[in-house]
Amino acid sequence: EVLISAENEIELPFQLPALESEAELKALDIHLRECGIFLIIKKHPLQSGWSLDEGAYTNIRYVTEEMLQKSGIQLYELVGLMDGLISDYSSIAVDYMLLDRPLGYVLTDLESYRNTRGFVFEHPEAYMPGEKIYNLEDLKDYFSHIAVGEDPFKEERRRLLPAMHTMPKKSGYCEALAEYLNIK
């Protein structure tokens, strides 16, 4: 069971809520290797420690905020380099939409989250333009699509983008920002 609370650590023994065993984590690692994909898991600040031997996995690594700080890297620098993003209900997924790259949403605790913390939207799934992930097979499907260049939610992202972001009416974001800051 995954516990999510501002007061408690988040317990994810296999680092992704969609995984239920070490065997599934190993199966995911094998699938990632076959797809030529390297998975970086950014741990939530409240998430408890990694209890497994990281060296046992060829295509899975995790990073913490502390590791990024020591390297002088901001999270969004890393995000800009990613070919895809898996998130839950975090605002980073909304920001990632601007890059127009594949998104996956881990929804294993959707009802629990709805009942405890709640959502901004009544039907949050309608605002998640990406693959819905509940288990290992869904994760494999998401990575398989990325590996072969398939993006089944591209049109849905484009349709939702104006609802999630104020888009500049002119040609570029820099020009719109300069006008907004009154420096042009």
Residue ranges and their predicted role:
Residues 1-56, 135, 166-169, 175:
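Conserved catalytic-core segment of nucleotide-activated headgroup transferases in glycan assembly
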Residues 14, 77, 137-141:
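An acidic, carboxylate-rich microenvironment
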Residues 33, 79-80, 144:
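Alpha-helix boundary recognition
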Residues 41-43, 87, 107:
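Short beta-strand/turn micro-motifs composed of small residues
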Residues 46-94:
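Donor nucleotide-activated moiety binding/catalytic core segment of transferases
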Residues 56-59, 64, 91-165:
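Catalytic binding pocket for nucleotide-activated donors in carbohydrate/polymer assembly enzymes
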Residues 142-149, 176-184:
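C-terminal alpha-helix
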